[in-house]
A protein has these predicted regions:
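Active-site rim elements
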Residues: 90, 99-105, 162-164, 216-226, ...
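Non-heme Fe(II)/2-oxoglutarate
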Residues: 43-46, 51-54, 188, 202-206, ...
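Short, solvent-exposed loop/turn segments at secondary-structure junctions
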Residues: 24-27, 132-134, 161, 181-184, ...
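Double-stranded beta-helix
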Residues: 137, 169-172, 180-243
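A short beta-loop-beta micro-motif enriched in histidine and acidic residues
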Residues: 121, 150, 160-172, 223-224, ...
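Short, surface-exposed loop/helix-turn segments at secondary-structure junctions
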Residues: 76-79, 147-156, 209-221, 273-278
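Non-heme Fe(II)-dependent double-stranded beta-helix
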Residues: 1-14, 21-156
């Protein structure tokens, strides 16, 4: 069993990240979510066909090839069915999302929470800033009209820059889970070691995207940039101030990861309009959420609320910020 040691925490505090090799078992811990996503893909393909967005169901293809093909033909629309959150804008009562039991159980995985506890303590809240990223080979995205960081390269950013300012003092921990192998060729994570020491950096509008996102200007990142290659079950822990991005997927297979966030109970999440939950509480164990159906309903309620009242902007900086010129 992998445990987080004092030396690991020291490395995290010094470098802004730590890689826990083999924290999760690829079959025991990740097998259920891989199985769940086969069903998610089947249902999504049926719905996309019914909506007239795709013509072919690609049933003859294996999972990896099929998901890549559908992402391409749907112009990225499939990603909404795969992600464990709602999009930043254009939410309606039919906006797809995934809130399945395997995803919920992974967020509550005891090995994961044992590790998280070493970083932020035993009163653990599941922050709703969370994503499933199934990134196809880059050539499948060559003709898409939308640039989505969940399926394309992820720009340089800090997770502290993707939420509202009320969470500036929240002790948010990012937990990045490798479902497949992640290496340089297929678009692994890149980090700027020690960049967390600089605090919150300027983020500017990314002109390459017609979907709302912001990135850190090149001049602020520095020369020290490190690729982190991982195997299935490896987990990367990141400070909310650590600058990071991902490389393009130049392989012929998907690169699949999840990034989750946790913070101490009672601290703002930075996305108050999305629902989090108590994942662990040693002081009040009865307050823990352990029913995936309740989690799913909380997201469905949020979707209905956001259909009537759109969410606040996710962006911390104005597009015409003079420092971005």
């Amino acid at each position: 069993m992998v445990e987080i040691t004092r030396e690991n925490l020291t490395q995290f505090n010094n470098e802004g990240f730590f890689v826990a090799k083999g924290l999760l078992d690829p079959e025991i811990d990740l097998g259920p979510i891989k199985a769940e996503y086969k069903e998610v893909l089947d249902n999504a393909v049926s719905d996309l066909q019914a909506r007239g967005i795709i013509k072919n169901n690609y049933m003859e293809l294996p999972f990896e090839k099929r998901i890549s093909q559908v992402l391409e033909e749907s112009d990225g629309e499939l990603n909404k069915y795969l992600d464990i959150t709602l999009p930043q804008k254009d939410i309606n009562s039919q906006t797809p999302m995934h809130c399945g039991p395997a995803a919920f159980n992974l967020i509550r995985n005891s090995k994961l929470l044992d590790a998280v506890e070493q970083f932020i303590g035993s009163e653990i809240y599941s922050n709703p800033t969370q994503h499933v990223r199934i990134k196809p080979p880059a050539h499948y995205l060559a003709g898409t009209t939308r640039v989505l960081s969940e399926i394309d390269t992820t720009v340089w950013h800090q997770d502290a820059g993707t939420g509202t300012s009320d969470a500036d003092h929240t002790n948010t921990l990012t937990v990045w889970i490798s479902v497949t192998e992640a290496f340089i060729e297929n678009g692994c994570l890149m980090v700027a070691p020690k960049s967390h020491r600089k605090g919150l950096a300027l983020h500017c509008h990314d002109k390459r995207a017609n979907y709302s996102r912001q990135s850190i200007p090149e001049r602020l990142i520095g020369e020290d940039r490190e690729p982190i290659e991982t195997s299935p079950g490896d987990v990367i822990f990141l400070s909310k101030y650590t600058m990071h991005s991902s490389l393009p997927n130049l392989s012929e297979n998907i690169r699949w990861s999840l990034d989750l966030r946790y913070n101490p109970i009672g601290q703002p999440t930075g996305r108050a309009w999305f629902p989090g939950f108590i994942a662990r509480s040693k002081s009040k164990p009865e307050s823990e959420m352990n029913d995936p159906s309740i989690w799913k309903m909380s997201w469905e309620r949020a979707r209905e609320n956001l259909t009537r009242t759109p969410p606040s902007s996710f962006q911390r900086w104005s597009e015409d910020d003079p420092n971005c010129a």
